[in-house]
Design a protein with these regions (language model features):
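A short catalytic or substrate-binding loop motif that flags glycine-/basic-rich loops and adjacent residues
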Residues: 123, 188-189
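N-terminal, charged low-complexity regulatory/assembly segments
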Residues: 1-69
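Short coil/loop linkers at secondary-structure junctions
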Residues: 28, 74-77, 159, 179
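Amphipathic interaction/junction segments at domain boundaries or subunit interfaces
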Residues: 59-65, 69-155
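Short, hydrophobic/π-rich interface segment
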Residues: 130-188
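A short beta-strand signature within small-molecule sensing/ligand-binding domains used
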Residues: 192
Length: 193
């Protein structure tokens, strides 16, 4: 995948959050260096997803794979390190925003266009998504029919890692003071998320 400014910025952001958490947990300094080196190697192999709305999630997937290849810890422990590092970052909280901004009706037109574009499947590893209309049960609904993180994990020979990144959505929703309800994930064998 191309190392665009966006990809490099997101990579640096995740790395700084995880690096700080590794330090808090007493890891050796070379662990963070090994993670970023491995992450760069994975991103160089990763299939292009263009200017996807979910490029930060794709980069997160690569970074998590790199952690699992570099720390000597279990996927669960690496998930906790990643989660705690992000939650401790004030910048992350600021960037995520809140429920009001995320659910703004002004964003619906862009979401619908994104959904339509995703169905063209221009990039093999990008997500394919349907936006669900507001109803009595929820303010915003998504059906992800294809998942870029699952595809990246499959390409890297570690499909079992995708499920840990699915859990990160609950962390993000909590940070934004939203409630996330999920009926299944592709990573766990469901037809869609």
């Amino acid at each position: 995948m191309k190392n665009s400014i966006g990809v490099l910025s997101v990579s640096k952001f995740y790395h700084s959050a995880v690096k700080a958490e590794l330090k808090r947990r007493g890891f050796q300094k070379n662990t963070a260096k090994k993670i970023i080196k491995t992450h760069k190697e994975i991103m160089n192999r990763a299939k292009e997803i263009g200017n996807s709305r979910l490029v930060s999630s794709y980069v997160m997937g690569s970074y998590f794979i790199a952690m699992n290849r570099s720390t000597g810890k279990s996927p669960e422990e690496n998930y906790q390190i990643f989660r705690d590092g992000l939650c401790a970052s004030s910048l992350f909280r600021k960037v995520m925003g809140d429920a009001e901004s995320y659910l703004s009706p002004k964003k619906m037109e862009g979401r619908l266009k994104w959904s339509e574009e995703s169905h063209k499947r221009k990039y093999e590893n990008d997500w394919v998504v349907d936006i669900l209309p507001v109803n009595d049960e929820y303010d915003l609904g998504y059906d992800y029919l294809e998942c870029g993180i699952c595809k990246l994990c499959n390409d890297e020979g570690c499909p079992e890692l995708a499920q840990y990144l699915c859990r990160m959505d609950f962390v993000l929703a909590d940070i934004m003071n939203m409630k996330l309800v999920r009926t299944g994930t592709i990573a766990e064998g469901a037809k869609y998320c």
